[in-house]
């Protein structure tokens, strides 16, 4: 076997690969052995006709399809390895010579990973945003805890709906006096003032009493998400079934003891502040890291092959499908609900897919230039972190299983983390 390499347009390489006649004949024999039981030749039991008889009876071409595949499977990976090529897609194969008694010649045109020309990545200037925790933030969090621990009780007959109440309602919606799909509900609990329903729907229920009905007139937002409802005026027939009030507990030391391990409300507030500060610090850290990486990517020069963006879009679509499945949905229902289609979603994802590909390539190039590697100890530590998501028992054993099954991904994750640390350490914070 020998090969010739030709560079075509950017990131595309064409190989002409010649397979010796003897090697191709071996592939034909292999094809014969694989397919012999398919052939019926008069005078021979099925599968027993010799190779030369099969050639004469059916023509040698009947064995070529598998023989070609055997040859390509044997030679193409070898050529790729010899030339240190990194394909990003399957090759485009064309047959040049396919004749009995001659060498088998084919071409393989393949898109390869693009070269990355790094720009400035050390010392990039990036703004860092701080997120201080205010007294209002703490109070809002405390109010949330108060809401979660509210006592719900039925209001007396004759009492009217007020802001903050929970109204249990039946409703049916109409557009142009025609009931629309998804516009009906029974025994629906609606907190008045929560903004759960559109427009001023909830406000129009204030003042109603149990068993009273009312036509509620609203207008759907222009971008509601369903073409047949976008921007349309609608009427809802609403009946009040029950009215409940929320009794909020007093925010005092007794409340603190009931909802936490602390004895005083001040201790609860201090704990809330501490947790929020840690969360905000992590948020600021991640944002800063993202900005540093984005700057390095923006400063680099890369010509991304379209196929890489397509492959990344395919991956993003699979990730979306997986998330939807977890919620009991599928892509078809998602497209219907969002008034979209696979083509529209792909177009929407394309920019993000391009950025993900660029970021991956730049991170790889920086790790190569800076000789960033992952030690065995770092891999084990990362695997242990991941194992904790699955179990707390036999953690070392689970970590070993995780590392064995996902070693490549874990290694890349560790290396990326070290590259980010390097970029952050060398970044210049500007106001």
From Swiss-Prot:
Cellular location(s): Cytoplasm
Family: Belongs to the FKBP-type PPIase family. Tig subfamily.
MF terms in GO: peptidyl-prolyl cis-trans isomerase activity; protein folding chaperone; ribosome binding
Chief localisation class: cytoplasm
Sorted UniProt keywords: Cell cycle, Cell division, Chaperone, Cytoplasm, Isomerase, Rotamase
Pfam families linked: FKBP_C, Trigger_C, Trigger_N
Enzymatic class: isomerase
UniProt record, GO biological process: 'de novo' cotranslational protein folding; cell division; chaperone-mediated protein folding; protein transport; protein unfolding
Residue ranges of domain PPIase FKBP-type in the record: 164-249
InterPro entries: PPIase_dom_sf (IPR046357), PPIase_FKBP_dom (IPR001179), Trig_fac (IPR005215), Trigger_fac_C (IPR008880), Trigger_fac_C_sf (IPR037041), Trigger_fac_ribosome-bd_bac (IPR008881), Trigger_fac_ribosome-bd_sf (IPR036611), Trigger_fact/SurA_dom_sf (IPR027304)
Coiled-coil residue spans: none
UniProt gene name: tig
Presence of keyword Secreted: no
Gene Ontology, cellular component aspect: cytoplasm
Domain notes from UniProt: Consists of 3 domains; the N-terminus binds the ribosome, the middle domain has PPIase activity, while the C-terminus has intrinsic chaperone activity on its own.
Annotated function: Involved in protein export. Acts as a chaperone by maintaining the newly synthesized protein in an open conformation. Functions as a peptidyl-prolyl cis-trans isomerase.
Gene3D superfamilies in UniProt: 3.10.50.40, Trigger factor ribosome-binding domain, Trigger factor, C-terminal domain
Protein name in the entry: Trigger factor
EC number of this enzyme: 5.2.1.8
Catalytic reactions on record: [protein]-peptidylproline (omega=180) = [protein]-peptidylproline (omega=0)
